[in-house]
């Protein structure tokens, strides 16, 4: 079993830059980091694993179904825009209680973090954009196959396209993680955290921030 630690749910606000003391500027991503509310504490004795379930933000009551409404009411927590879980070590469970809040104090400037988000959806795309295929000749007798993928396989034997063949299809909107991003600045008053570099997804998308698993 790996080493688990508490994480944080934020929302990507956009990108900016920060000037260092020596005059250099570095690109940063700003993440809106309002307090996470603990909804449930899962234990290995009852649930088979140890985890902290949290929510963040708010949601109109008409958008909360009955099972979710009962779940939030049991915890006496305002309904948020979703539910997320973070696996933790059993020894960490005592640090949290249902209804309590998790803030930015779990992170520090200079710390390395892993960030997970949903990439931008690109819809249905061809092989050139989706898999970086090379285009066919623009002229020299080519009039129909400028962006064609090329051969899909053999003939009667094996008589099929092998699984995993790179073809056109839906691109983006998948879960992606970026590892070892440095925390550059934490603004507790504005509920913002700035990390070095880019993170997956569009502005406004939810992201999960965890302590780096590999350093």
Swiss-Prot record:
Record-level Gene Ontology MF annotations: rRNA binding; structural constituent of ribosome
Transmembrane segments: none
Example GO biological process: translation
InterPro entries: Ribosomal_uL3, Ribosomal_uL3_bac/org-type, Ribosomal_uL3_CS, Transl_B-barrel_sf
Keywords noted in UniProt: Methylation, Ribonucleoprotein, Ribosomal protein, RNA-binding, rRNA-binding
Cellular component per GO, a single term: cytosolic large ribosomal subunit
SUPFAM superfamilies per UniProt: Translation proteins (SSF50447)
HAMAP family: Ribosomal_uL3_B
PANTHER family assigned to the protein according to its UniProt record, in alphabetical order: 50S RIBOSOMAL PROTEIN L3, LARGE RIBOSOMAL SUBUNIT PROTEIN UL3C
Subunit (UniProt): Part of the 50S ribosomal subunit. Forms a cluster with proteins L14 and L19.
Protein name: Large ribosomal subunit protein uL3
Species in which this protein is naturally found: Xylella fastidiosa (strain M12)
Lineage: Bacteria, Pseudomonadati, Pseudomonadota, Gammaproteobacteria, Lysobacterales
């Amino acid at each position: 079993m790996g080493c688990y630690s508490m994480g944080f749910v934020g929302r990507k606000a956009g990108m900016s830059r920060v000037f260092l003391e020596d005059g250099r500027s570095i690109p940063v991503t700003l993440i809106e980091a309002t307090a996470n509310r603990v909804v449930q504490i899962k234990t290995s004795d009852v649930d088979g694993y140890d985890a902290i379930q949290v929510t963040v933000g708010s949601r109109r009551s008409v958008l909360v179904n009955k099972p979710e409404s009962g779940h939030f009411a049991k915890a006496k927590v305002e309904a948020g825009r979703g539910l997320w879980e973070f696996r933790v070590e059993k020894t960490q469970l005592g640090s949290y209680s249902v209804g309590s809040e998790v803030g930015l104090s779990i992170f520090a400037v200079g710390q390395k973090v892993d960030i997970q988000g949903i990439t931008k959806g690109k819809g249905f795309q061809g092989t050139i954009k989706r898999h970086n295929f090379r285009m066919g000749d623009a002229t020299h007798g080519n009039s129909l196959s400028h962006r064609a993928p090329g051969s899909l396989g053999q003939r009667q034997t094996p008589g099929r396209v092998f699984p995993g063949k790179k073809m056109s299809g839906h691109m983006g909107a998948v879960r992606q993680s970026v590892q070892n991003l440095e925390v550059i600045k934490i603004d507790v008053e504005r509920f913002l955290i700035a990390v070095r570099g880019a993170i997956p997804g569009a502005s406004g998308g939810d992201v999960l921030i965890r302590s780096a698993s590999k350093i």
